[in-house]
Amino acid sequence: YKMQSSIIILVIILYFLGLFIVSNLTIGNNDNSTFFSANKESPWYLVAFGMVGASLSGITFISVPGDVGTTQFTYFQVVLGYLFGYFVVALLLLPIYYKLNLTSIYEYLKIRFGSVSHKTGAFFFFISRITGACFRLYLVAIVLQQFVFNELNIPFEITVLISVLLIWIYTFRGGIKTIVWTDTLQTTFMLISVLLSIYLISKSLEWSFMDFINSDELKSYSNIFVTESFLDKNHFFKSFIGGMFITICMTGLDQDMMQKNLTCKSLKEAQKNMIIFSIVLVIVTFLFLLLGALLFIYSSKFNIVTPELNGAVNSDLLFPEIALNSGLGNLIGITFLLGLIAAAYSSADSALTSLTTSYCVDFADLKDKSNDYQIKIRKRTHIIMSLVLVIVIIIFKNYLTTSVIDGLLILAGYTYGPLLGLFAFGILTNYKIHDKFVWIVTSLSVIVMIFIGSLDPQFLGGYKIGYELLPLNGLLTFIGLILIRRK
């Protein structure tokens, strides 16, 4: 049994029609303040709900359930760290951004240190955001390719091109204002999808939800805490601290995530949004872990083979395999597809908008130019960013092997580290620095980190570096900045 491609394509078309309708209803006027900050009128609960979708990109949707087979529920340790990190963002960073009334959060670095720091910060955001958004879209494009477009003989490149084109169409007028709304829609699809999948798979195993929670099969997957050996990559302390810093950087120091928060009416609303969002996120991630366990129980019971990609077994493809090809009916297939597409696009569309915003505000210095000129540059940037995404994804397809979640988090460790160092130094100390040397300090800390990250664990006495790469990298930058401070 397989779902027919025609049904799948119909679902995709209907989904995007829905998005276009929403984007037309929210368009308002075409000016840059709508595109960049939604005229600061977004209702906080919409932002909070939509952010869940953007954080739980396609990666969470496929890789988190897929990783349960090897790491069980240990990812939840990282998630608890996230929760703590969100409190830091809400109580420490948001007040600063609101007080300075920023459009791009990297303007803080310009105010605090100077323009080289500003450009350096924005540059690191650029690299991490482009690769991050491409990772997410790449993952989904591969699933769509493998389960739909191969049968129609449509090459991968075309799949990607169409994907990005669709995003471009519904964001190029409304920008962030549209995205706050479309993300809400996308989060809804994602939640329905995970809940329905849990329900339908339990049903086919003839379990109620409580049967599943109490089952012996679940016990073999539900180990959360790793506290035995500190050398272990997934040790609780390392995962928790790592998770906390991942949030502080990948949310708090990230234009993409903060841009939605800065569209709220006031600091109080933005903080409320952040706290509620973090609690919802923890619950939702736990649902994804439960789903993961369920998928593995189901596949071992019915002998479903995990598909391969480039000759290696790829756990990321287990969920799509079960949803689309295991005879559970069209409903689960359709909800899976909607959830997956929603997950991927809700992070990619905001990435496209935030990259455009960052370029216009941080590099092109548009604030002093005439309004028409600003809009022209913004539109041109938007098109170029879209093309960059397409090219990078096609490069990924030809050169990538590891499981996607690892790749993304390792990469984040290298590119968000300097941002962590710069912001921490700015907030925690009062020193001025020799601005022109900033790029040397940040580049060096990244190079040193890449070297440390590639060391064999035997050198470090069996110590495996995990998620704590990021805080270490930030610390290096921090120390470097102390060295170039003005006496």
Protein language model regions, located:
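Membrane-embedded helix-loop-helix hairpins and adjacent transmembrane boundary segments
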Residues: 3-487
